[in-house]
């Protein structure tokens, strides 16, 4: 069961810390990969998708496959269109910071990724939707919304006192955004400590 698996992961990490062996651990369980590994290799149909530390893979997935595979709920992926200094998600128009404009370059159509825990519910937000489902797991709630564009988005709310039923807008920080090429699904780059990086394959 889930508790036994957690105990096994803890014991495996403890043994590794004591004896320091080189270990290759193969798993389909993303939680095991994130909690046990120093570095993760993500494969799809036998092809390498990304190799990096768990935190890097979580924050800067190399492509939409990795973004969807790592994390539960998985990263929200929304269709977006860049126009001058703004990005459009459905009818919502959001200003794009200068460094992100450098990453985007001449691209127009993009996929914007944002993890559920990095979204905030706000009635006044530019991105609007309607709540379709609320899952309460005790320590947090996951709110599912359908945007005006017809796309679905998940928002994780840890504040037990938050009024999730009367907040249908979604806002987020550009610090938490991932942008992907609409054709290949590849991460086009990211911002880290004020610097622009154009390779999210691994580090």
Regions found by a protein language model. Name each.
Residues 47, 68-72, 139:
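Gly/Ser/Thr-rich helix-start
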């Amino acid at each position: 069961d889930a508790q036994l698996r957690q105990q096994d992961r803890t014991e495996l990490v403890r043994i590794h810390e004591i004896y320091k062996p080189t270990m290759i651990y193969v798993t389909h369980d993303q939680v095991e990969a994130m909690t046990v590994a120093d570095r993760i290799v993500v494969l799809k149909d036998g092809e390498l998708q990304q190799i990096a530390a768990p935190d890097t893979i979580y924050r800067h997935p190399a492509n939409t496959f990795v973004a969807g595979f790592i994390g539960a709920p998985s990263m929200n992926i929304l269709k977006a269109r860049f126009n001058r200094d703004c990005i459009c998600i459905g009818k919502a128009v959001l200003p794009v910071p200068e460094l992100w404009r450098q990453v985007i370059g001449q691209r127009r159509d993009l996929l914007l990724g944002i993890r559920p825990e990095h979204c905030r519910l706000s009635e006044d937000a530019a991105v609007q939707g309607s709540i379709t489902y609320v899952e309460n797991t005790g320590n947090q709630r996951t709110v599912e919304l359908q945007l005006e564009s017809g796309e679905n988005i998940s928002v994780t709310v840890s504040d037990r006192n938050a009024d999730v039923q009367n907040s249908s807008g979604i806002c987020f920080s550009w610090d938490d955004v991932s942008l992907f090429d609409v054709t290949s699904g590849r991460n086009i780059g990211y911002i880290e400590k004020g610097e622009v990086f154009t390779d999210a394959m691994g580090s």
